[in-house]
């Protein structure tokens, strides 16, 4: 009798653990990496190491993490039936039945509540940004994702909202050139996601996303190429016309560059890094490996190296030491 009771207790523990793991998987925490976009304004305004501003953006980051997870769970609830026929998505907690729909809905509503609670205490504009993001994502799940072109625009809009939400928290102004960069990169990632999905599901009968059936590879190829070019070109224009003020340490010989370019345009040295990153990502797209951009950004060594190098150079230029503005 005692053995039976012990086995029952262990079974309950296993079930509870499996349920918890399913709930965490449904929230897709790996996708939170996309919310690092909220730190963009903080980085380029030169206030990255201001503790008050950093704390505000970090709380905003947490709020968007909750909001992002909630929208993914809601989308999984709506797509549960079709996902069961997808070669990859059928393993998701809701589609596989590991997380019952009722509990998934409770989890999603709880995460929405946490996101709005954090947003309310930060900034009215940020609060509206979270609400807008949630509304757009719900509409996307309800059917907008089935409309070609519009689905790509909505995915891209999510990235744009993140960047500007981060700016709202610290009352920062982002230039028009930077907005162009954000839009271009967002469209590049979104079109790349669709192109990779089409590459994965080669059999038309297995395509579960309605909009994907109406896309041609040639069209998505042109989108990827167009937005990839727009991304590095808009970044180049940003570094030339709107580059933040440089701050450099003992390497003052670099100030001599100002004779021909001005020190405030030192961010232009990151252009080759950006071009390499885009070329590498395009290669991954056509290999069908960019259906989930966040995983690629964490696992592809070449891409990770280019992102780390790009960020390091920017931090070095903007935060490296004494100001050389005016040289």
Each model region followed by its residue ranges:
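Topogenic membrane-insertion module of multi-pass membrane proteins
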Residues: 2-84, 97-110
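C-terminal membrane-associated helical module and adjoining short loops/tails
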Residues: 2-24, 142, 160-327
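Alpha-helical transmembrane segments of multipass membrane proteins
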Residues: 39, 43, 113-117, 135-139, ...
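Structural signal for the C-terminal ends of transmembrane alpha-helices
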Residues: 43-49, 121, 139-143, 192, ...
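Short, aromatic-rich membrane-interface segments at the entry and exit
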Residues: 52-56, 124-130, 148-152, 173-179
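Acidic (Asp/Glu-rich) catalytic motifs at the cytosolic membrane interface
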Residues: 64-95, 144, 150, 191-199, ...
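Multi-pass membrane catalytic core of lipid/isoprenoid biosynthesis enzymes
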Residues: 80, 85-130, 176-188, 222-228, ...
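Cytoplasmic-side transmembrane-helix entry/capping segments in multi-pass membrane proteins
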Residues: 148-158, 300-303
């Amino acid at each position: 009798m005692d053995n039976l009771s012990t086995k029952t207790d262990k079974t309950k523990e296993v079930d509870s653990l499996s349920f918890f793991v399913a709930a965490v998987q449904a929230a897709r925490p790996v996708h939170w990496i996309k919310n690092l976009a909220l730190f963009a304004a903080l980085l380029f305004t030169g206030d990255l190491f201001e503790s008050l501003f950093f704390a505000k953006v970090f709380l905003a980051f947490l709020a968007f993490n909750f909001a992002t997870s909630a929208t993914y769970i809601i989308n999984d609830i709506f797509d549960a039936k079709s996902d069961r026929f997808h070669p990859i998505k059928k393993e998701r907690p809701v589609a596989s039945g590991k997380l019952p729909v009722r509990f998934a809905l409770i989890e999603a509503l709880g995460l929405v509540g946490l996101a709005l609670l954090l947003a309310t205490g930060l900034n009215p504009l940020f609060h509206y940004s979270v609400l807008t993001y949630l509304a757009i994502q719900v509409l996307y799940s309800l059917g907008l994702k089935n409309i070609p072109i519009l689905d790509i625009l909505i995915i891209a809009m999510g990235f744009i909202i993140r960047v500007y939400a981060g700016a709202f928290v610290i009352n920062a102004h982002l230039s028009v050139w930077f907005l162009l960069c954000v839009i271009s990169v967002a469209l590049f990632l979104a079109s790349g996601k669709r192109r990779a999905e089409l590459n994965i599901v080669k059999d038309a009968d297995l395509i579960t996303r309605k909009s994907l059936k109406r896309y041609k590879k040639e069209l998505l190829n042109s989108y990827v190429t167009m937005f990839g070019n727009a991304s590095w070109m808009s970044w180049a224009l940003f570094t030339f016309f709107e580059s933040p003020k440089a701050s450099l340490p003992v390497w003052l010989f670099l100030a001599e560059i100002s004779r021909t370019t001005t020190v405030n345009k030192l961010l232009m040295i990151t252009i080759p890094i950006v071009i390499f990153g885009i070329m590498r990502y395009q290669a991954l797209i056509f290999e069908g490996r960019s259906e989930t951009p966040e995983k690629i950004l964490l696992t592809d060594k070449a891409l990770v190296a280019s992102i780390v190098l790009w960020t390091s150079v920017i931090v070095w230029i903007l935060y490296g030491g004494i100001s050389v503005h005016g040289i």
